[in-house]
């Protein structure tokens, strides 16, 4: 499983180098095949291909008569791109996805268990501040009794 946040740089060709600690797991799990797609929070989601397939299958079964379902399909399936990690552990971020997430030179790769989020570094810092402000209020019911 993937965890931790790592600051990375996009190279001149729009690629990131996957941190060494994740490369072997990705090669073993999916032969370096990753699915990148847009997220509603303004970042990108990066899935090992086997983790993406059940999500794709569920999304594809949603009713095309429901406007929210169509919007979700357009966001996630419409932006999805299969990319393969090269021998140096680099992954191309397609221009359309770089534009969507406003990715510039400095990015953050954030492990989220079965996937990664890829953020523009400035957006990551801003959302971290928002997340910390949420913690000042009441916890949602599902987190009551949760302890670290």
Q: Positions of the model-derived regions?
A:
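A short beta-strand-loop micro-motif that forms or neighbors metal/cofactor-
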Residues: 28-43, 80, 102-119, 123, ...
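Acidic/histidine-enriched, glycine/proline-rich intrinsically disordered or flexible terminal extensions
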Residues: 131-148
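Beta-rich strand-turn-strand
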Residues: 81-90, 95-104
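Short, charged/polar, Gly/Pro-enriched secondary-structure boundary elements
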Residues: 25, 54-55, 124-128
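Helix-adjacent hinge/juxtasegments
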Residues: 45-83
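Exposed loop/turn and edge beta-strand positions of beta-sandwich/beta-sheet ligand-binding modules
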Residues: 4, 12, 79, 87, ...
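Short, structured motif recognition centered on aromatic/hydrophobic residues
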Residues: 14-18, 47, 89-93, 97, ...
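A positional/architectural concept
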Residues: 2-44
């Amino acid at each position: 499983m993937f965890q931790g946040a790592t600051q990375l740089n996009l190279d001149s060709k729009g690629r990131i180098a996957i941190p060494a600690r994740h490369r072997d797991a990705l090669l073993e799990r999916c032969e370096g095949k990753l699915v990148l797609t847009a997220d509603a929070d303004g970042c990108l989601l990066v899935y090992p291909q086997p983790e993406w397939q059940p999500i794709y299958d569920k999304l594809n079964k949603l009713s095309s008569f429901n406007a929210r379902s169509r919007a979700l399909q357009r966001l996630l399936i419409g932006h999805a791109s299969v990319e393969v990690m090269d021998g140096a552990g680099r992954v191309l971020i397609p221009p359309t996805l770089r534009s969507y997430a406003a990715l510039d030179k400095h990015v953050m790769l954030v492990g989220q268990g079965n996937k990664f989020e890829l953020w523009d570094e400035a957006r990551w810092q801003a959302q971290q501040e928002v997340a910390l402000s949420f913690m000042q209020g009441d916890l949602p019911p599902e987190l009551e009794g949760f302890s670290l």
